[in-house]
Amino acid sequence: MLKQKKFFISTPIYYSSGNPHIGHAYTTIIADVLARYKRLFGYDVFFLTGMDEHGQKIQQKAFEENISPKALVDRNSIIFLNLWKRLNISFSKFIRTTQMDHEESVQKVFSYLYKQGKIYLGQWTGYYCVSCEENYNPAEIIKSQDNIMLCRMGHKLETKSEESYFYKMSDQAPFLKTYYQNHPNFIIPNERANEMVNNFLNNLEDLSISRTTFDWGIPIAENPKHVIYVWLDALMNYLTATGYLSNNEELFQKYWCDNETEIVHLLSKEIARFHCIYWPIFLNDLQIRFPSTILSHGWIITKEGKMSKSLGNVIDPNVLIDTYGVDALRYYLMADLSLFRDAIFSEDNLIETYNTQLANSYGNMISRTLGMLKKYRNNIVPKYVGCVLKNDEKLENLINKNIELVQENINKYSIDKALNCIQEILVEANKYIEDNKPWELAKNQQEQELDSLLVHLVKVIQVTTTLLSPILIEGSKKAVEQLNFDESFLTLASLASYDIFNYHKVNDSKPIFARIIVEKQ
């Protein structure tokens, strides 16, 4: 018996100082879609997401609201969880860094690395960004027109000097450069690896990993006036969520200790530095395998540029769900936005993509096919007898080829290209209808030809519904109900067979994706 393949995918844990926006939704939907596809492909999947709940910014925010930091992060974790529920996110675990088991494991990690000589006590002086939770040296800062020091994200910097524990990193750059070269798929896209080398590794410094100016964090057991700085705390969630250094390491052993597990960290490009440089150094010193791939996607921007609260162009995914529905949002983000570059979010494009690819193409194919089955065959799918029409074989070959291409593209994280392959099947099927003219086949009593056409169209619906099911969670369920399928019809194994529909009775058609009509101003 073949060993089941394993797939571990994580989002970054999201900082718990504010409400989720479209960027959070985008990252999490990508991870969910990849997790669902891998389950469809037969993988054992562990999908991790959660909240980063320590740090100065949270402590300040709680003070401003006159509540405790714990009350703030408790409230915000519920807000994120409610959004994930609305977006049909199928995570395996939702971790919070304020959980006791995480905090205890992080303290153990610090103590181990300190005893190994990887960590030392020193003095940190420089520029600090509260918003980014990041230190900046003079070479990295930007001066505004009025001479204010800004970080690369445009936030105001503070000048600080304090006692800090440091992680020895300055001598690890050659090791990482070699690893990048020998493992070209470690960082995707490849230009992100080049950014790491050119912008950071050539001047890699030891990393400050503790703070004394605030206390909302994990205290260091050896020196409790220090709390562990966000990145050593936050990055460890990928291990602690699986029970690393706890009383139950079963999941850690299952996923992290198996070198054949495909481990993917999905994240936005602004935090690539921490995952591509600091994280592998931590793992190397802990003698733990590296992730297979760090998948660093681009930003969602607007026509005005990057989203920011000050510009008032931050997009609330809840509003989009209320307006267009969850499937429309999930599909648009996966179909129109490539992971590997920045993409402009446009509601006009969302509507166009929805109407063209879901309402007109996929939804209309279901309506037309079920309508013909009702009209010509009393809702009964005819028996499959092979290729009868001259273009039956062409359609079958395209279906088989594109099923494989969808899998190949998903395994390369090219979700948009996979969806193009699915749409190609639907476009060809519409052409197949127009070429064969079922209304004339019925009129001329060409029963065998009409039967073949109907069977092949049901196969098109089964294949496209199966391949779209990781994205269209609600729409695929409605399609299954109308087709009177059970879950066994929506598996890769079932896609190879045409005779599973023999004399299968379908239900009447109801619109699944009604067109969005935009009133002209």
UniProtKB/Swiss-Prot annotation:
ATP binds at K309. A motif ('HIGH' region) lies at residues 14-24. CDD domains: Anticodon_Ia_Met, MetRS_core. Its EC number is 6.1.1.10. It is found in: Cytoplasm. Zn(2+) binds at C129, C132, C151, H155. Monomer. Belongs to the class-I aminoacyl-tRNA synthetase family. MetG type 2A subfamily. This is Methionine--tRNA ligase.
